[in-house]
């Protein structure tokens, strides 16, 4: 699946976003095979098997939310290598 925000930008690991009004960061994107360096291959395989498609968000308060695809409450803010 081609993961994109409703605004059309591709979803990538490290993106800064707003989800339900709360700041968050995209931790990984299964569909693009984008993972943090410290995530084991075993963990990656489990995510692929359990979820198949989607991405994980981590909010500033530490809460993690898995989404199978973008929804109307998810807004792109900036790429990881750009200033917010």
Which functions belong to the PLM regions below?
Residues 1-13:
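Mixed-charge, Lys/Arg-rich low-complexity intrinsically disordered regions
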Residues 22-37:
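Short beta-strand-centered aromatic/proline hotspots
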Residues 48-84:
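Intrinsically disordered, low-complexity, charged/polar segments
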Residues 7, 20-22, 60:
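Short strand-coil-strand connectors
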Residues 42-43:
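Terminal, intrinsically disordered low-complexity segments enriched in charged/polar
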